[in-house]
């Protein structure tokens, strides 16, 4: 045994110790010094070993490590003990630790192997590793090899714990004791002596089932006398010592599971071998470990949100069903829903659990909630269930919801523990954990909902996520009845329309009451279930009939006058008016004039375009109550306008489309431009403004403008204005006209108008509005004669749900980005590289802000080296995120949030135009001294702020300093930064990190005393020298030479002789102060701000420097 186990790596062996100890509920703390001494006495080790153990305090981990033969021999050699006794000690420790395990949970590095016995091995110390643990494999070995192990019975189900059982005690009926009859039981991976599928535990009896030859050498009485309470502590709790007890193991051919003794209750008498067992994964790793006190199951209706149900006192399936319904607040009888077994993420819901199967599944429950039930309306009740009862599924309410005239459905009882908000996602899915949308004044009385004036209105109610199993079944190849359900007409419609219905087999159209002034008849059902929506129903109003020759163009005005131009879908009939005092009436139409509809429509539009709009009255929101409409117009209405009308409308409104090359110069020349408030940006093809946008887009397909740099040449990052102006070039993978966001400026604030769907606008228009806002801020700053532009902080994303909008996502008319729910962003072109990842341009499509995202890819390869690399990367990113979350300073790159996925980690930062100081030096050359003072002062402000927050940057250099077109310098890249409680005290835990040429001497060689934040001051001196000289410090030395001069000779970077005569004495004094070798004397960042070199000329203007001209030239 010593030879075999000694050949194994110590790491692998220690892992098996951990597994064995874990299975037996044995803590390393049990191996106190007293227990170790008791162990030595038990195995009759001499007094010398006891003295050495007491002197060296060998206990706990130190004692367990001696199970490694090489470590035991090394310990014996060090303490002048015999090598043979060390080998014996190692063998005894391994027996004690490994032998008691009768089952072992498979880890990621091991799998179930077959229990083997090698008859040719004659050594007493040879063990064979199996899925059942570590057992002696020598059938002829004497009791010497296991004399300290008490007799016990064998684990049958794989979940019972017990002590080691020698192979001589496992005898098969009618077989020789030197032979092993191995039978793979159905549902059990453990090979034991068995016959006809029934496992029989062979018990250690003093006068039975023990090899006579072995007994002659070592009496059993002597074996029992050596049993002590010391070894009994390693038995698994709940271990049964009943003699000759035969147990039947229920099994399944497809997926075996084993019951723990502490979990097994009285099974039904009809449960024979081969009966049904729950098909739940990962169950076998949770059973047979400890005796539990309570039993829990999880219940869900969407495989994402689970409810914990305590079934400790449940005795039968009926009680279980009632308890699940009560826990999920389902006010229905137990006959109205079915239960299925499920897992997180979903499963195939094919097998309904009847009472017998449910009772069996109940027996498999544990304190970990391994058993999970999926609750689904029963097939018999589903078709006959009314809409209100069906909508009660998935909601936490003590009663069903009743829809009234003003709402679709509303909450009757709020969540008491966890608040949940309705989220409008890209595929129009409501991810609400429980409470329904509150509409028409039914506001929830909940402190978490304060600040929301009303809930958003939806055109359709989506299908519950719990019913989205059709695609999963198709992929897995469903057959029979399930395949028939998948391929029926109802299922086939889901391929064309993602909008789903709450009632699967009955369509209920939306009916809304009209006001008294409407000519439409009042529907008798308009007052009942008015807002129950259907699966294939697209909400809209019917198009108006064609006008007659005598019909007037005047009708009820619903347009809104706003100060800025908004773009939305136009209508063939544009509402007009002459004065605010004029009264409007509905246009009357003659249905007999259908033959002249096209000509009349053309004339109406032409005449309309000449009517002024200054005197149009403002929108009276009270008029909307009797004139319901939807944001999406029917497709057939667009065909009523001839194509030539586009040119007529455009020409009448005097839009200069021929000069649309420059988007900024091409503004509407007439203040009479109407605002198409009733339309939608998803289809703006009929509006004059859309024609202008289409033409400008067509012109942009020509060679790119000189104002935008090549996307592959990022020497200078373009300004935000240039990015907004040519947003298609920097986000080429997206169709910006189809990505929609909610227009916050038009959100309905009145609770009585929540049935009106919010207006939408495209990301292209959102970007344009953001650009106009920036120009307005700049204009106001110049008008107020402000020296610097007002700083505008980016939107913080910490704590919010952040989702990347993939370019290959199918974007439909319902793909809307909600402003109040999640932050969605689009990834643009690559703009740089960081310490661990790449930096991309991005846009927050909720707000239109341009941001930068640093993405770090997590290695997915499974091996030890990559696992450590993965851990190092994740730890580094987590440390960076924790440090920078609260930083907010003008001279620090602002961190906005982060998003973690299985493949990468994204950190969101503010977008800084321009470029790094290092790149500017390589392209431009040395900076003027006044410019160096200007930049250095800003860096010192940023460093002083970082040090006040307890952060040491440790990688300050020119490449990590960004400067924008306004001359603002920002410190970036906190990948190796470190937090310290006292930044100016030496921290011995800090390792050598940073770039060699910018390192301080104490970083390289500090005699284990560590260093402080003053290393950043040294690095600042290197940056100042770099800006003045135009090249890096130690420019004439290699990295090894620089390390030797810094660490051994304690020298500072040399100042070029030609530079001394070109710069002022203050600059030389500043460099000498930064390059003070003694860190205790070196000044702090706060002190350096008072240095004479930090005083800038009051007349200095960054835009008058050659660097600014170079940046603008590179940009263009």
Swiss-Prot record:
Keyword Glycoprotein annotated: no
Disulfide bonds: none
One Gene Ontology MF term: protein serine kinase activity
Binding site for ATP: 831-839, 854
GO cellular component: cell division site; cell tip; cytoplasm; cytosol; division septum
Lineage: superkingdom: Eukaryota
Basic residues compositional bias, start-end: 553-569
BP GO terms, sorted: cell integrity MAPK cascade; fungal-type cell wall organization or biogenesis
Reactions catalysed according to its record: L-seryl-[protein] + ATP = O-phospho-L-seryl-[protein] + ADP + H(+); L-threonyl-[protein] + ATP = O-phospho-L-threonyl-[protein] + ADP + H(+)
Family: Belongs to the protein kinase superfamily. STE Ser/Thr protein kinase family. MAP kinase kinase kinase subfamily.
Protein name, as recorded: MAP kinase kinase kinase mkh1
Species of the source: Schizosaccharomyces pombe (strain 972 / ATCC 24843) (Fission yeast)
Lineage, broadest ranks: Eukaryota, Fungi, Dikarya, Ascomycota, Taphrinomycotina
Gene for this chain: mkh1
């Amino acid at each position: 045994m010593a030879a075999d186990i000694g050949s194994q790596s110590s790491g692998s062996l220690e892992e098996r110790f951990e597994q064995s100890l874990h299975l037996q509920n044995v803590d390393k703390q049990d191996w106190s010094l007293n227990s170790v001494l008791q162990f030595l006495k038990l195995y009759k080790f001499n007094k010398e070993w006891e003295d050495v153990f007491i002197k060296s305090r060998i206990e706990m981990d130190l004692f367990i490590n001696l199970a490694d033969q090489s470590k035991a021999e090394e310990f014996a050699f060090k303490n002048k003990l015999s090598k043979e006794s060390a080998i014996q000690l190692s063998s005894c420790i391994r027996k004690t630790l490994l032998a008691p395990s009768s089952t072992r949970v498979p880890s990621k590095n091991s799998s179930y192997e077959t229990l083997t016995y090698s008859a040719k091995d004659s050594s007493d110390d040879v063990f064979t590793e199996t899925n059942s643990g570590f057992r002696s494999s020598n059938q002829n070995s004497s009791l010497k090899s296991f004399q300290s192990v008490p007799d016990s019975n064998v684990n049958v189900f794989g979940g019972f714990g017990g002590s080691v059982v020698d192979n001589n005690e496992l005898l098969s009926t009618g077989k020789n004791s030197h032979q092993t009859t191995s039978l793979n039981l159905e549902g059990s991976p453990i090979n034991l002596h068995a016959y006809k599928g029934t496992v029989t535990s062979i018990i250690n009896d003093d006068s039975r089932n023990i090899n006579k030859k072995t007994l002659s050498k070592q009496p059993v009485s002597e074996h029992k006398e050596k049993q002590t309470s010391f070894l009994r502590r390693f038995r698994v709790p709940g271990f049964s010592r009943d003699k000759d007890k035969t147990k039947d193991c229920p099994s399944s051919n497809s997926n075996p599971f084993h019951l723990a003794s502490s979990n097994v209750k009285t099974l039904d008498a009809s449960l024979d071998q081969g009966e049904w067992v729950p098909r739940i994964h990962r169950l076998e790793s949770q059973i047979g470990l400890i005796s539990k006190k309570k039993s829990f199951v999880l219940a869900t209706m969407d495989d994402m949100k689970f409810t914990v149900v305590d079934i400790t006192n449940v005795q039968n399936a009926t009680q279980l069903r009632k308890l699940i319904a009560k826990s999920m607040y389902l006010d229905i009888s137990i006959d109205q829903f079915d239960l299925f077994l499920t897992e997180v993420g979903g499963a195939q819901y094919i097998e309904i659990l009847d009472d017998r199967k449910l009772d069996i599944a109940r027996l498999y429950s544990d304190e970990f909630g391994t058993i999970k039930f999926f609750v689904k309306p029963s097939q018999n009740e589903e078709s006959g269930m009314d809409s209100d009862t069906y909508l009660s599924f998935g909601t936490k309410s003590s009663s069903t919801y009743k829809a009234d005239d003003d709402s679709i459905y509303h909450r009757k009882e709020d969540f008491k523990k966890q608040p949940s908000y309705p989220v409008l996602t890209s595929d129009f899915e409501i991810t609400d954990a429980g409470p329904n949308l509150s509409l028409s004044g039914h506001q929830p009385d909940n402190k978490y909902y304060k600040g929301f004036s009303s809930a958003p209105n939806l055109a359709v109610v989506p299908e519950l996520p719990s019913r989205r199993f059709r695609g999963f079944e198709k992929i897995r190849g469903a057959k029979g009845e399930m395949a028939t359900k998948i391929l029926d007409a109802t299922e086939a419609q889901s391929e064309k329309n993602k909008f789903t219905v709450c009632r699967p087999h009955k369509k209920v159209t939306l009916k809304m009451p009209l006001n008294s002034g409407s000519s439409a008849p009042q529907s008798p059902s308009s007052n009942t279930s008015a807002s129950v929506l259907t699966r294939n129903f697209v909400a809209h109003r019917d198009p108006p009939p064609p006008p007659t020759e005598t019909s007037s163009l005047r009708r009820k005005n619903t347009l809104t006058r706003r100060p800025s131009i908004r773009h939305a879908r136009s209508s063939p009939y544009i509402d007009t008016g002459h004065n605010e005092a004029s009264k409007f009436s509905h246009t009357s139409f003659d249905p007999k004039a259908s033959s002249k509809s096209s000509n009349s429509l053309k004339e109406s539009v032409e005449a309309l375009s000449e009517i002024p709009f200054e005197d149009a009255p403002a929108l009276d929101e009270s008029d909307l109550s009797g004139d319901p409409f939807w944001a999406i117009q029917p497709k057939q209405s667009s065909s009523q306008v001839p194509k030539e009308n586009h040119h007529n409308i455009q020409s009448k409104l005097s839009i200069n489309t021929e000069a649309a090359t420059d988007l900024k110069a091409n503004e509407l020349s007439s203040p009479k431009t109407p605002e198409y408030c009733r339309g939608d940006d998803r289809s703006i093809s009929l509006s004059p403004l859309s024609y202008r946008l289409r033409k400008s887009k067509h012109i942009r397909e020509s060679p790119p403008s000189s104002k935008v740099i090549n996307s592959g040449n990022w020497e200078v990052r373009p300004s935000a204005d240039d990015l907004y102006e040519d947003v298609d070039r920097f986000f080429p993978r997206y169709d910006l006209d189809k990505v929609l966001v909610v227009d916050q400026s038009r959100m309905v604030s009145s609770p009585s108008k929540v049935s009106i769907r919010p207006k939408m606008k495209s990301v292209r228009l959102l970007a344009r509005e953001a650009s106009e806002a920036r120009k307005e801020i700049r204009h106001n700053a110049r008008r107020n004669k402000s020296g610097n532009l007002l700083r505008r902080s980016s939107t913080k994303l910490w704590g919010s749900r952040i989702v990347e909008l993939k370019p290959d996502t199918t974007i439909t008319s319902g793909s809307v980005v909600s402003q109040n729910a999640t932050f969605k962003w689009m990834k643009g072109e690559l703009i740089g590289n960081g310490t661990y990842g790449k930096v991309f341009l991005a846009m927050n499509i909720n707000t239109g802000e341009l941001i930068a995202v640093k993405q770090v890819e997590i290695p997915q390869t499974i091996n030890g080296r990559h696992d450590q690399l993965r851990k190092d990367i994740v730890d580094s990113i987590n440390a960076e995120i924790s440090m920078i979350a609260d930083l907010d300073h003008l001279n620090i790159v602002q961190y906005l949030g982060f998003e973690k996925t299985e493949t990468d980690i994204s950190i969101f930062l503010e977008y800084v135009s321009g470029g790094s100081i290092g790149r500017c030096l390589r392209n431009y050359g040395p900076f003027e001294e006044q410019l160096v003072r200007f930049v250095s002062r800003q860096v010192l402000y940023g460093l002083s702020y970082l040090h006040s927050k307890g952060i040491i940057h440790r990688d300050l250099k020119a490449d990590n300093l960004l400067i924008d077109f306004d001359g603002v310098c920002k410190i970036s890249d906190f990948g190796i930064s470190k937090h310290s409680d006292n930044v100016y005290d030496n921290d011995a835990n800090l390792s050598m990190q940073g770039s060699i040429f910018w390192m301080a001497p104490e970083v390289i060689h500090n005699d284990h005393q560590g260093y402080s934040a003053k290393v950043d001051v040294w690095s600042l001196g290197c940056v100042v020298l770099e800006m003045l000289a135009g090249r890096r410090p130690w420019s004439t030395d290699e990295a090894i030479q620089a390390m030797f001069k810094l660490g051994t000779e304690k020298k500072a970077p040399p100042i070029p002789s030609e530079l001394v005569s070109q710069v002022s004495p203050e600059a030389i004094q500043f460099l000498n102060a930064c390059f003070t070798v003694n860190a205790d004397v070196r000044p702090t960042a706060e002190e350096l701000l008072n240095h004479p070199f930090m005083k800038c000329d009051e007349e200095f203007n960054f835009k008058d420097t050659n660097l600014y001209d170079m940046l603008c030239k590179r940009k263009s």
